[in-house]
Each structure stands twice: as C-alpha cells, then as structure tokens.
Amino acid sequence: MAFRLKSDVRLAGSWLCLRGARALGTRAVTASKASVLPFEVIPQHQGNKRQRVLQFWKEQNHDDLHLEMHQTFQELGPIFRCDVGSTRIVAVMLPEDCARLHQAESPYPHRMHLEPWMAYREHRRQNLGVFLLNGPEWLSNRRWLNPNVLSPKAVQNLLPMVDTVARDFSEALKQKVLQSAQGSLTMDMQPDIHKYTVEVSNFALFGERLGLFGCNPSSQSLKFIHALEAVFKTTTQLMFLPRSLSRWMRSQAWKEHFEAWDYISEYAENRIQKKYEELARGCSQYNSIVANLMLQGNLPLRAMKANIMDLVAGSVDTTALPLMMTLFELARNPTVQQALRQESMATEPNIYENPQRLRMELPLLWAAIKETLRMYPVGLFLERFLTSPLVLQNYHIPAGTLVHLNLYSMGRNPEVFLSPEHYNPQRWLENKETYKHLAFGFGVRQCIGRRLAEVEMLLFLHHVLKSFCVETAFQEDVKFAYRFVMMPTSAPLLTFRPVS
C-alpha cells in the first residue's frame, strides 16, 4: 500500500467492502425537457392522507421510515409526492435538486415547525431560537450567532478547548485499557462517546468542564445527559401527531418531554447567570460562546437562553453517531484504519504546533468522516417550504409545498455514488462535486454548529487512532431506526488495543 502525506493522500491496493451489503439503485425518471409537467402527475406515494395520519396514530414508532422512503424512491423514481395531514410533501433525492432548491432559496429559508419543541416554548412562554424560528426574526438571531459559533474566528477560539477534551478522552480510554488484564478493552462505545460530545458542548458553550470521563461523574451531569436523551425519545413519539390527538393519546410522553426540557432550561439559565456574574467581576477574556455573546451585548437575554437551549439539544447526537460509526467501519476496514493512523502520526507535530491546520493536515480523516455521514446520515432529510414555484425533475412544484431532500437515499444511490455499499473515503478526495456532502445542510440555513462539529469529530478520531487499534468481531451491517435522528438499534462491540 502506498501512502503520501498532505492533501494528495493516495491509497493503492484493495479496499475492504461492507460485508453483507447489496447495491441499491433507483429507477431514473426520463422526462422530456420540452415542457414542464404539472404537479398532479408526479408519482404519488400510495395511501390517502387520512390513512397516513391514522397509521402514525396507531403505531408507537416510525423506526423504518428511512427504509420505507428508500423503497418508494426505488419504485417511483427520484421524485414522488404524498400528503401527511394537511401538509403537501414532495420528496427528492438527487444533488441536482438540492442545487435548484439552493438557487431558489429566499433570504429567509423556511422549515417546518417541530411541534413538540414549539409546544414547550409556547406553554412556558419562552422565546424561540434559530432552530425553531422562521422569517426576519430567524435571520436577526442567526446574524447575532454566526460570528460566535460558525465563523472561522469562532472556531479558532474554540479549537484549543475541543482539543483538550479530545486528549482527555483518549487518555481516559488509555487508562481503562491499561487496567484490563487482557491488555485490550472490548466495550460498547455509545455511552462514552455520548459523554464526550456532551463534555465538548458544555465546555464550548459555558466554559465549564463536567468531569464526565472520571469514575464518578456528578449526579447533576448524569441528569443533564438523561434529560437530553428524554427530549429526543419523546420528540419521536410526539412529532407525527397533531397536538389535539397526542395530548390524550400520549400524555405520558408529553409529561416526560416537558420535564426534560424544564431541566435543560433551568440548567442553561443557571449557567448563563453564573457567566454573567463572572463577567461582572471583571473576567473579560474569551472562554466560551456564552461569555462572548454577553461581552458583545447584542443578543437580548431571553433570546440568548432560547438559542443556547437549541445549541445544547442539537450538539450531542449529531456528532455521537458519526463518531461511533466511523470507529465501527474502520474496525472492519483495517487497511483504511491503518492509512488514517499513518496520516495522524505523521502530521501530529504540525497539528500540535498549529491546530488551525487540522483539516488541511488530515484530508483522509476528513474524507472518512464524510463517507460515514454519506452512509449513516444523522438526519433523514433536509426540508424547505417553497416560497415561490420551482421546477424539480421537470415537474412544476407550487409555492407552499414542503420539499424533503432525502439524504439516506442519496447516499445509497449508485447513480450518485459508485458502489455505495462500499466504505471508501478515497471517493471524497477524487470527487469535488458539490451538493453531495449535505450532512450539515446547505445555504444560509446550514447547521450553525457545523464547524464546531467538524473539529470535534476530527480531533476525537485523530487522538484515538494515534493511540489505539480498533477491532470488531461484528461484521454484519448495523441496523438503524428513525427516532427523530437516525439511531442504531444496537451497538457493535469494539475492541481497543494500544498501538505498539
């Protein structure tokens, strides 16, 4: 195997493919470009809208939604329509359709409200943050937040903090391995990775460490993690039904949902108040996103709390899943893993001296993360309400339609990705086409925490792979369920051995 450093990393030799996987294709629609076809002739998902609402009502979960949508694309082609209640939806899955959506985007890209989260904020008379807002108020909040969360300067400030947490995690894992009599450690990594993402999020937002890597994390820290888990679990149970139905059908889920948000709300308020008191005592240096927002003084306190709650909820599972699945894929693709380890070891001195060069120094590792997100997207789809008519796949889509861009089906489409069943990071070094890496969205409404998430994942994998060989006896594909975000139904055990 040949290996070159920097941006022209090259791998020669065979790539190990996913065991048991099969190629998944989508029948293409070949419509004449001479005339645009009316909305009514778009292939339609079977079943009327009342039946679909009753189905959501009857079922306790929607675990296979990604598989159902994928099968529908295979049967009907790259575009289809359906109604859920009173909402008219068009589903697409090709990069060209994302490009058209982006080109037609208004200054205020409009997304569907997440009903359970909206219900909590309204009932508690709290402000909405950027995740839930639409229109000019969304843009105003976003402009206040972007310089402190998304900008290159913001990431430059946050990167040393994330690096500290990633190094501490690797060191804590090393201590666990050394304490093992076998000289290696086999474990379910989900809980530990979850602790890592919560630790990073809390440190970046509030400038405080939670101490989650120790033997006895505080009960307050564990309660915070449980509250985050409860929000996501109950969101899935409630999001598909109108409040008028779910209030009496799923009253226990509403109770758990509100209790979890109450804890997160109180947690955020206490941390914001503590930071305010620190700044009042003259601690004016940069040490967190909240501190910087306060020093600038542009964001009203109620709006700050609302946005911090959004950032807290959105910053954990979005990185935990890709980290776990990257470790799993590297465990069953040892040739790829070794190439990444060589890259990390060769570039460690440069990264240590200048952490800002992280992405430039680790192109293959970044490609591996993109490949993981292609195969295992955290979000099932991106969505936009059309503010003006648009043509997609030669069909007229009227204004007011909700368009779903399905990431799972795009990533599994052989017309978009050659041999999509193969875990092949190299494809991202060779292919520079846009609108294929969409895990963090697109346009002005892309994920506000994407750059923080990117360095969080890069630094975690960089430090872990330098220190450990990762193995697994589990060679089957991991099954996933849709639970507001994509989640594995069970986690494969991973074995960590110190690098000799």
Swiss-Prot record:
Q: What PROSITE patterns does the entry give?
A: CYTOCHROME_P450
Recorded E.C. number(s)? 1.14.15.4
Give yes or no: UniProt keyword Heme.
yes
Q: Which reaction does it catalyse?
A: a steroid + 2 reduced [adrenodoxin] + O2 + 2 H(+) = an 11beta-hydroxysteroid + 2 oxidized [adrenodoxin] + H2O; 11-deoxycortisol + 2 reduced [adrenodoxin] + O2 + 2 H(+) = cortisol + 2 oxidized [adrenodoxin] + H2O; 21-hydroxyprogesterone + 2 reduced [adrenodoxin] + O2 + 2 H(+) = corticosterone + 2 oxidized [adrenodoxin] + H2O; 21-hydroxyprogesterone + 2 reduced [adrenodoxin] + O2 + 2 H(+) = 18-hydroxy-11-deoxycorticosterone + 2 oxidized [adrenodoxin] + H2O
The primary location reported for this protein is mitochondrion
Q: Which InterPro entries match?
A: CYP11_CYP27_families, Cyt_P450, Cyt_P450_CS, Cyt_P450_E_grp-I, Cyt_P450_sf
Q: Which GO terms label this protein's molecular function in UniProt?
A: corticosterone 18-monooxygenase activity; heme binding; iron ion binding; steroid 11-beta-monooxygenase activity
Per its UniProt record, the required cofactor names are:
heme
| Key words, A-Z | Heme, Iron, Lipid metabolism, Membrane, Metal-binding, Mitochondrion, Mitochondrion inner membrane, Monooxygenase, Oxidoreductase, Steroid metabolism, Steroidogenesis, Transit peptide
Which positions are annotated as binding heme? Answer: 447
Protein location:
Mitochondrion inner membrane
> Pfam families, from UniProt?
p450
Pathway(s) of this molecule: Steroid biosynthesis; glucocorticoid biosynthesis; Steroid hormone biosynthesis
**Transit peptide feature range:** 1-24
Q: How does it sit in the membrane?
A: Peripheral membrane protein
What is any one of the record's Gene Ontology cellular component terms? mitochondrial inner membrane
Q: Name one GO biological process term.
A: cortisol metabolic process
The record describes the protein's role as: A cytochrome P450 monooxygenase involved in the biosynthesis of adrenal corticoids. Catalyzes a variety of reactions that are essential for many species, including detoxification, defense, and the formation of endogenous chemicals like steroid hormones. Steroid 11beta, 18- and 19-hydroxylase with preferred regioselectivity at 11beta, then 18, and lastly 19. Catalyzes the hydroxylation of 11-deoxycortisol and 11-deoxycorticosterone (21-hydroxyprogesterone) at 11beta position, yielding cortisol or corticosterone, respectively, but cannot produce aldosterone.
- Membership in a protein family: Belongs to the cytochrome P450 family.
Q: What is this protein called?
A: Cytochrome P450 11B1, mitochondrial
Originating species: Cavia porcellus (Guinea pig)
Phylogenetic placement of the source organism: Eukaryota, Metazoa, Chordata, Craniata, Vertebrata
Gene encoding it? Answer: CYP11B1
